[in-house]
Regions:
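Conserved N-terminal Rossmann-fold NAD(P)-binding element of oxidoreductases
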Residues: 30
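Minor-groove-contacting beta-hairpin "wing" of winged helix-turn-helix DNA-binding domains
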Residues: 381-385
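A short, conserved structural fragment
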Residues: 371-380
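C-terminal scaffold of the Radical SAM
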Residues: 25-27, 46-72, 81-356, 404
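Local cysteine-cluster metal-coordination motifs and their immediate loop/turn environment
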Residues: 33-46
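Short, amphipathic alpha-helical interaction segments positioned at domain boundaries
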Residues: 387-404
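Flexible, acidic/Gly-rich N-terminal and inter-domain linker regions that tether
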Residues: 1-26, 36, 71, 75-82
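Short amphipathic alpha-helical interaction segments
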Residues: 356-368
């Protein structure tokens, strides 16, 4: 068990929920669960063919916003917070009428005022963007666009079940530029069945050529219950082995670094100053509020989520499985999330938050991991090396196990 003092004051425990983010900053995530077609790999809460529910769903979002604009257990959120980031994800937010998005963003001001220069991101599919929707997003204050490109190979796009073509990715970026967006992310996927290193390199080069500010490169995870999992289980599809996956990741690091994109988290790369501020809140364990079906929240040291069932959400079910995190929960989450970033774990911040040096009781594990080339300590931070990030889960378990 931990040698740290478990009898911290309630005031100190509450401070942990904002580990590196000022208390006054709040992030909001809004889930739009509708999509034109469920992708073969997707196990997110997304629902095709529910157009008739769009209006009801956003009415429920508005009702949830009204609840959060009223007095909560800790008082009015508007008295404590300013909204620093807002992220509209899905599903496919760009599928629904843009008016819903405009009204929802505007309504969030009832929860708390926006900080000057707040980052407001809308996620979307290149096949569902139009100039009219982009203009509406700009009017609503959206200043960052995240597009699910996934691949530039037509065959791979079809096998993934994507509804857009490779050509529409470039068209979407052009449309976004013409609408005034100067902060665009593209999501890419690797370790796909049938994808070789040449195809992955071509995808990286195609994304770089579009000149976007941010790129995310996610390794395919074959989730149980998805069509992709059924294909893999039947032998109809074969995913690359671990060595091939790691080689693809290293290719992304090298190719993107040469093009001016700096890796700042296991799966994310940005031009200097264009890191996704919203995701940094998650990795730094700042306070965030999730609105909509399946949305998760971390607020004032409490974690809770809305139901994943769209029908339950439409019926008014809210805030399931609410728990107040223990000190051990806080430490484990902090370690797991901070080591995803290139910056790593801030050792002074850890000691300030938890009352003892991180190294105490972990000397042997740290020594083994350093000797193995998986972690390094310097500049007041413990960070994972490139090799360490390839096995991040195992590194974190090693560090946690030393403290049991």
């Amino acid at each position: 068990m931990s040698s740290f003092n478990q009898n911290k004051s309630r005031r100190d425990l509450n401070n942990h929920s904002s580990f590196l983010i000022p208390h006054s900053s709040l992030s909001i995530y809004i889930h739009v669960p509708f999509c034109a077609k469920k992708c073969a790999y997707c196990d997110f809460a997304s629902f095709p063919g529910r157009e008739a529910d769009w209006g009801r769903y956003f009415d429920e979002i508005m009702a949830e916003i009204r609840l959060w604009s009223e007095t909560t257990d800790s008082g009015l959120l508007s008295e404590k917070y300013r909204i620093a980031t807002l992220f509209i994800g899905g599903g496919t937010p760009t599928l629904v009428d843009a008016g819903y998005i405009e009204k929802t963003i505007d309504a969030c001001r009832r929860i708390a005022p926006f900080e000057p220069g707040a980052e407001i991101t809308a996620e979307g599919n290149p096949g569902t963007l139009t100039p009219g929707k982009l203009a509406a997003y700009r009017r609503a204050g959206v200043n960052r666009l995240s597009l699910g490109a996934q691949s530039f190979d037509e065959g791979l796009l079809r096998s993934l079940g994507r509804i857009h073509t490779a050509g529409q990715i470039g068209e979407a970026v052009t449309m976004a530029r013409e609408a005034g967006f100067d902060n665009i992310n593209l999501d890419l996927m690797y370790a796909l069945p049938g994808q070789g290193m040449d195809q992955w390199t071509d995808a990286l080069d195609a994304a770089i050529a579009l000149g976007v500010e941010h790129l995310s490169a996610y390794s395919l995870i074959v989730e149980p219950g998805t069509p992709m999992a059924a294909r893999v289980a039947s032998g109809a599809a074969t995913v690359p082995d671990d060595d091939a996956v790691n080689a693809m990741q290293r290719q992304a690091i090298a190719r993107l670094d040469a093009a001016g994109y700096r890796r700042y988290e296991i799966s994310n790369y940005a031009r200097p100053g264009r890191e996704c501020r919203h995701n940094l809140v998650y990795w730094n364990r700042g306070d965030y509020l999730g609105l909509g079906c399946a949305a998760h929240s971390l607020l004032g040291g409490r974690r809770f989520h809305n139901p994943e069932s769209l029908d339950d959400y439409l019926a008014g079910v809210r805030r399931q499985d609410e728990v107040r995190l223990t000190l051990q929960d806080e430490m484990e989450e902090t370690l797991m999330l901070s080591t995803r970033t290139v910056r790593g774990l801030d050792l002074a911040a850890w000691e300030n938050a938890f009352g003892a040096p991180f190294e105490r009781g972990r000397e042997a594990a740290i020594g083994r991991l350093e000797k193995g080339g998986l972690i390094e300590i310097g500049g007041g931070h413990l960070r994972l090396t490139t090799r360490g990030m390839e096995v991040q889960d195992a590194v974190v378990l090693e560090l946690l196990g030393e403290n049991e």
